[in-house]
């Protein structure tokens, strides 16, 4: 409770750091904040071409199947890899002033979360424009899934950011882990493709039920 109270006392600092991170993401670029929407769209196009056209995944409306999973994965991947360095990236501030070190990973993950929410605007725009449709009842569970993913991403960032202070190579190791983790998660393929003998191990992946939940709500339109 004391930690929560202390974080509440530093809420203005957290909000300020979130705003600073959001403004600084694409500072100096010609398109600026538009990259928030362009980046996931370009990734969607590339993955759709590779897995739907070249590898012939054979999933109906693969672009939507992929998009509703890719955006949450981009958020998690950023927290996994970049969140690890959030304390080291602010080491001068850490040396000069006192504040709960939890503020740094918390503000970084929150910034990434806001960025994901903005990307979801594109998802809903695509759903509306293409007439894909939404199940309003299933949609009520979307905030819960987002909160669970946020909590997981924050927990991992808290651990990795603390460890990276002592083990600098961890950030590079996490980049490799992140790439492998994506392909062990049903982001670009349906979970039904996983052989039964590996399914128990597959389900131990904490991102599997989260990505599956996003897809159930927005693609399959059921709970």
Label the predicted regions.
Residues 1-223:
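Hydrophobic transmembrane alpha-helices and immediately adjacent juxtamembrane helices
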